[in-house]
Amino acid sequence: MSVHTSHSRHNIGSLEVSSSQKISASSGLVHSSRLELHLKADMSECENHDPFVNAGSKTIDINSTYVISACKKTRETPVTSDPRRLSLQRRATCGDRESSLLGSELGNRRTADTSLRLQRRHGRADYVGKWETLNPVGGNPGSDSASQASRTEAKGVNNDTRVLSSVVSVKDSNDTGLTRCKDPGPPVGASNEKVTVKDTNSRAPVGSQRQTEAMRSGHLVVQLTESKSDTPVSGGRNSHRGNAGKDTAKQVGTFGSSDTRTPVKCVLEHRWTPRHDPPPPKSPALSTPKNNGKDIPKHGSTFRSASSESRTPVKCVPEHRWTPRHDLPPPKSPALSTLKNRIASPRVKPRPKSSLFANKRESSRESTLPPEENSLVQKTFTEPDSLKVENSQVTVAVRVRPFSKREKTEKASQVVFTNGEEITVEHPDMKQVYSFIYDVSFWSFDECHPGYASQTTVYETLAAPLLDRAFEGYNTCLFAYGQTGSGKSYTMMGLNEEPGIIPRFCEDLFAQIAKKQTSEVSYHLEMSFFEVYNEKIHDLLVCKGENGQRKQPLRAREHPVSGPYVEGLSMNVVSSYSDIQSWLELGNKQRATAATGMNDKSSRSHSVFTLVMTQTKTEVVEGEEHDHRITSRINLVDLAGSERCSTAHSSGQRLKEGVSINKSLLTLGKVISALSEQANGKRVFIPYRESTLTWLLKESLGGNSKTAMIATVSPAASNIEETLSTLRYATQARLIVNIAKVNEDMNAKLIRELKAEIEKLKAAQRSNRNIDPERYRLCRQEITSLRMKLHQQERDMAEIQRVWKEKFEQAEKRKLQETKELQKAGVTFQMDNHLPNLVNLNEDPQLSEMLLYMVKEGVTTVGKHTPSSSHDIQLSGVLIADDHCTIRNFGGTVSIVPAGEAKTYVNGTHISEPTVLHHGDRVVLGGDHYFRFNHPVEVQKGKKLSSRNNLTTSEGPKDFEFAKNELLTAQRSRLEAEIKDAQLKAKEEMMQGIQIAKEMAQQELSSQKAVYERKIQALEAELREESQRKRLEELNNQKASHKIEELERAKQHLEQEVYVNKRRLEMETLATKQALEDHRIRHARILEALEIEKQKIAEEVQMLQENRGNRDKTFTIQPNWNSMKLSTMIQEANAISDKFKKCYIFGRHDASDKGRSDTSVRVRNLQLGISTFWSLEKFESKLAAMKELYESNGGDRDEDVFCDPADEWEPDITSTPVSSLSRRRSRSLMKNRRVSGCLHDIHPIQSMQSSHSSGLMEKPSTIYSNSSESFLPGICKELIGSSIDFLGQSFDEEKTIADSLINNLLRLHNGVIAISKAHEEQDEESQDNLFSDRAAQALTIQVACAFEQLVVLFKHWLGDFLPCTGSARLEDELRQDIKKLGGYLQLFLQGCCSDISSMVKEAQNKVMKIIQQAVQCVGQLAVLKGSKLCVLENSSKVSSTQEFMAALQDGVTSGMKSLLDSGLETAQDLRQDLSRQSAREEVTKQMKASTVEWVGSLENAVAEWRTKSFRTQAQEGSRQQVSKLLSLASEFLKLKSCLQQTVEMIVSALRGCPSDLHCLRSCTETICSLARKLHSDFSAHSASAGSCGNELPRADCEELESLAKSLLLCFECGESPGLSKPWESCSSNSKEEQCKSDRADCGKSGPRRACEPHGDATPAVSSGDCTPNRIQWV
């Protein structure tokens, strides 16, 4: 008996032996016990003592299927027999007998004889999504002798082992089987399988000389075969134990060389095979990438064990092993990692995999079925399961571009080099060499290089494999990354003559569709194109928004299944490559249109081009066609380039764009870094949502996608830092592992499985001789339920087809509409080469000359783009007038005529009269639209004006830079005058500020002088009084001579005291006079300094005026392009302010300080007399918001655009007369920075006065900072005490969050009024600040705390309630009101602090208005959410504020009206939904009619309640009526919820699903009860309000209850036992879930009922009448 491997050309090879041969074969293989050899192809493990494994360098584990020939002699030819006798089949294990009722029944009966059949094993190898094919090994495919193997010798060892000699066998011309010695792995088959033996005596020729020599040398070659029941080894997905059809391919190779022949001997090993073996582990896919499209292995197709001269024989020691009952899968060989790139992978066609139902019902394939039915079932069960899942790393390619023109001019040095797949970067400064290895490296530096990578090479190598994977059903993504100017857009889009990846991809896509599309396979494609700019998403395939408005940025959302998506993005159906070309052209021109008007978009954005391909495969089952859909999403992303601000010299809007781009790319880098760490086994957070770009690419990075990345780099040394950063970026991206799976339509998959199940059940039904009637009845019920599901899915498929057609028609209509709209905006798809035209010029070269405006014969009008505009050329922009200009074309002469004051420039010159245009002229409209005029006829005739020869022929191309410099040169004088005017105005304002400061100082010094003079007079008067008192005392002393002696001592004492007081007064008088003298000297010095400063400024003003008068002199200030842009932007801001009738004026402000000029924008509020200054960056951002407001024609946030609460407003001194200055006004002007800058040398009067005051005149001075330090702790202490008291209070007064919101709004209202009143009552001549008072400080802190609590409570309130109808809009309104309230509070406090009365009054009015709006919104939301307002019951707090209470009442009544409107709409929708349901039985028709009538009656009742509520709202209601409305709202919400639940149960019953009668009865009773109560309450409410409306008759309420009873009766008839039980048997799980949800919902509004099945157990149904009525429903 000889042992060898067997191969066949056919998928199923038959083995033919006789009965005696089988006995001898089995007994020859049994050692001491009678063990049977289990023939099973599975992955096995080599022994640890194998030198090839120990060396770690030679081979891998290979599955081997051994064929043992039952011959008496070694070289005996096997006996041939009938191939139909025996075939190898898989015996199903007990773990497979669990799928269905029939399957479990049939699985218990198994035949004793299981036929055996050897089948061809197919395999698959994976390497980055690529398939590889080896050269064929066999000879002529048609030759039978080519399939014979070389001779095999078997040697006996101790009479119980067999040694295998080298064998070569070939399956077909496409398979090569090369392997080494293997231990047989643990089989998975049954224990009673038979083994047949066969011997082959031929050798197959090989394809190459090396392989031929290796085979002739006699080395071991084993070809693997595997039956259908094999488990997967690699590249697939494991399922249950014993799954059928999971086949894979293993790598095979040869040992040896052409010099020697080394026999390799192995010993068969006996093992106990487990009954249930777990599937072996997956081994890494071993393959090599394609080599320029050739199927040649990269490192050869043979293995060598030692050297090419000699080989050492290797023997495997015979060994007996006991295998456990449940064996573990063998471990992976360590040699796999070292042989990944050195093993040739055969390309084989994967065999279809068995479906899910085939796995579950394996036990049902028995011999009891007829042969034709058995074959049909087997054919059905072997359908492929396309839900494949693969782990694949991101493929990274790097492309090196050539030098640019600038780099060639600068003679840049090359620092980037390639060597195969390795890229090296030589740093010129650090003298270091950096090496990087990627999957693919494209060298596009030199076209003469033999390895030059063209656009075709890049596409075929990188993008074409992604297209193949897309056809397999995987999502794919390709994105390009690199610095600005590295060639990303050229790689992705390309040029007309050299198209890039996207055009080639689309063209190849439709080419393959044309080849693959048949009558059974159809393809549908949809495309979208959008950009991400400054974290905003813009659809590039839509011209304008709804109702002709400006289209708004889109928002990103996330679907729980399909992942992130763009809400509202247009998806257009495309049927050919020309459609995609037109849409791409439209999208690119949309970008150009957007970038022309200097608005918030430009070409510096991330663009995402998406294709959604749906493959529909038609399957015919039982004569019916069913569709199976596979969807693939293809994302082609062109990322914006990263840049360094210092290198790009960007500023302003460009700087902001760069910051946004770098931010999104930084987030992308963080995501890639986190994913690379996650691939290494770490658990990290992936910040997808930090950027819009990464959120949208979530599935492409670490998700369900096959992703490739191409990094473009510059080879120049000047960009080495960016190059290294890009390469490191790409290196991290290689570590990302995606989990890609085939996107199969689950409905189609379910249809296929249901069809297979039906076929199986029908086959079982026809052979029911061994099945009892009870199981037969259950099978019929299952068939009926499956038919129901199948027909429902078919209806869904028909609906999907209809939607597809509608979407295609809408896409065509939209395309025509967009084309017409874009023709007016300059996007011309067809042009006449003889007509004159205008082409756009843009700062971005890629967007220049993208828009073409044809100038027709006659008059062409140009104006603003509006929905009602009829102009031939429509432009957008603030400075574009409604009727801007007209272009006349008569007789080949074209002239342009400006209209009114619209700004029109020709060759940089502002024109105000008709001007003739010539070929090449530059036309600028509105200051920001640049065009070049083309006249083909004039060029052909060679017309040239002599006056323009020097201008047109001596200069370069007329691009944007040329037009910009030309306009700047022509407008230089105007810009210089504007700059000088700004500087002159700034100097004049400075002089005015100095004059005001001088007069204020004069006033302060005069008042201080008067104070000192009064003090001196008081001291002199006191001195005189003291002298007079002394004289009187002396006279008294003389008169009282008799008391002289007694008073002598008193006299002396008095004399001393008088002397001391006199001396003191003299000293104080002298000090006061000295201080007055010092003050006069200081006053003189200050006035002298101010006068000198005034003269200096006057001289500068005079010099500026002289310069302005003398235009021929050279100016010191040279205007640049930024000055020109700033001038245009200021004009736009003033135009927008004027349109909205705002009192804001914008102007340029140039302040020179120590020779350094500081430019800013001054914002003046003429109404309030205040001004502030904006930096250029802030002005640009504000202008962008103004333009957005301008395009949307205003809105609620128009005031926020012009007035920023964070601005530091100050009094405007330009219109302030000095004579009207009061002390309070002077104090506010002192805070003006120009005035305070002039008075920085003057100390505060209080401190000077306190420094010289002493004695009797000394008084404590109060300074604000000191007082605040003393007051603030006490105020905080009181607030903490009030908070502690609040803890001890009961919650009777404040039970809901709505009450807390209203109380905080009331606190804000009262606090603002109190602070405003204190500000008004402040003395005009007082020098104290308002907030030096303790009460004002306390009020301010209370206002701040109340606003903080308001914000916190609002956020909590939104999270406590589920969204209801109409609440989303009110919540947004309330959020905006609170935001505005905070801004106006900031302005109010700033006005109080700055003592600007106009600002305080304006802010107070705004605050009061916003508070009333917020209170009204809270009232409406309280009604819609069913909240109570206890503040209405305890109205003592709000009784004093009538406006506040009126707003709350208006909100409650408006909310009630909205609630009734939503209830009416809900009832109408439910009635329409019921009308759309189909009913085929009489019972269901009656149920449907009763339900529709009942809902209609309830709808009429709601309409009547709405009418009464509206009448009540028109009258003035009391607080009690408002509280009554709130209670009515809560009851109405319960009624609405019960109505929805009831209709859902009835609709479910009409569709054939089970429902609970008890829950339905409870809901209907609750609805009738609530309707009766609401009717009486609304009637009483209307009567109390004085409304005289018609009441709903009581008969109508009774009719509502009667209809409800009729509905319940119909429902009971429909749920009778004979009709309901078949549904209960097939849908028990869904019924239990429905009952649980119904019971939970009914518990909210009615009594709890037990949701149990109605009726007793269903009697057995005979086979003759199995639920005929239910079948009619299908």
Swiss-Prot record:
Its main location: nucleus. Residues 743-826, 961-1110 form a coiled coil. Keywords: ATP-binding, Coiled coil, Cytoplasm, Cytoskeleton, Microtubule, Motor protein, Nucleotide-binding, Nucleus, Phosphoprotein. The modification Phosphoserine is found at residues 257, 973, 1326. Residues 1-391 are annotated as: Required for PRC1-binding. GO terms for biological process: activation of protein kinase activity; cell division; cell proliferation in forebrain; cerebellar cortex development; cerebellar granular layer structural organization; cerebellar Purkinje cell layer structural organization; cerebral cortex development; establishment of protein localization. Residues 132-158, 171-374, 1618-1674 are annotated as: Disordered. Residues 142-151, 202-214, 302-311, 1660-1674 have a biased composition (Polar residues). Residues 391-772 are annotated as: Required for microtubule-binding with high affinity. InterPro entries: 4HB_KIF14, FHA_dom, Kinesin_assoc, Kinesin_motor_CS, Kinesin_motor_dom, Kinesin_motor_dom_sf, P-loop_NTPase, SMAD_FHA_dom_sf. ATP binds at residues 482-489. Residues 267-279, 317-329, 1630-1642 have a biased composition (Basic and acidic residues). Residues 860-911 form the FHA domain. SMART domains: FHA, KISc. GO terms for molecular function: ATP binding; ATP hydrolysis activity; microtubule binding; PDZ domain binding; plus-end-directed microtubule motor activity; protein kinase binding; tubulin binding. Disruption phenotype: The lag homozygous mutant mice that lack detectable Kif14 expression are indistinguishable from normal littermates at birth. At P10, mutants exhibit an overt ataxic phenotype that increased in severity over time. At P12, lag homozygous mutant mice are unable to stand for 10 s on a narrow platform. Their gait is wide and uncoordinated, and they frequently fell on their backs while walking. These defects in voluntary movement control, posture and balance are accompanied by progressive weakness and failure to gain body weight. Residues 936-1674 are annotated as: Required for CIT-binding. PANTHER family: KINESIN-LIKE PROTEIN KIF14 (PTHR47117:SF7), STAR-RELATED LIPID TRANSFER PROTEIN 9 (PTHR47117). Directly interacts with PRC1 within a complex also containing KIF4A, KIF20A and KIF23; targets to the central spindle. Directly interacts with CIT depending on the activation state of the kinase (stronger interaction with the kinase-dead form); targets to the midbody. Interacts with ARRB2; the interaction is detected in the nucleus upon OR1D2 stimulation. Interacts with AKT1; the interaction is detected in the plasma membrane upon INS stimulation and promotes AKT1 phosphorylation. Interacts with SVIL; at midbody during cytokinesis. The kinesin motor domain binds to microtubules with high affinity and has a robust ATPase activity but a very slow motility. The kinesin motor domain protects microtubules from cold depolymerization. Binds to each tubulin heterodimer resulting in a microtubule complexes. Binds at the tubulin intradimer interface, at the crest of the protofilament, and orients slightly toward the next protofilament. Microtubule motor protein that binds to microtubules with high affinity through each tubulin heterodimer and has an ATPase activity. Plays a role in many processes like cell division, cytokinesis and also in cell proliferation and apoptosis. During cytokinesis, targets to central spindle and midbody through its interaction with PRC1 and CIT respectively. Regulates cell growth through regulation of cell cycle progression and cytokinesis. This is Kinesin-like protein KIF14. The lineage of its organism: Eukaryota, Metazoa, Chordata, Craniata, Vertebrata. The gene is Kif14.
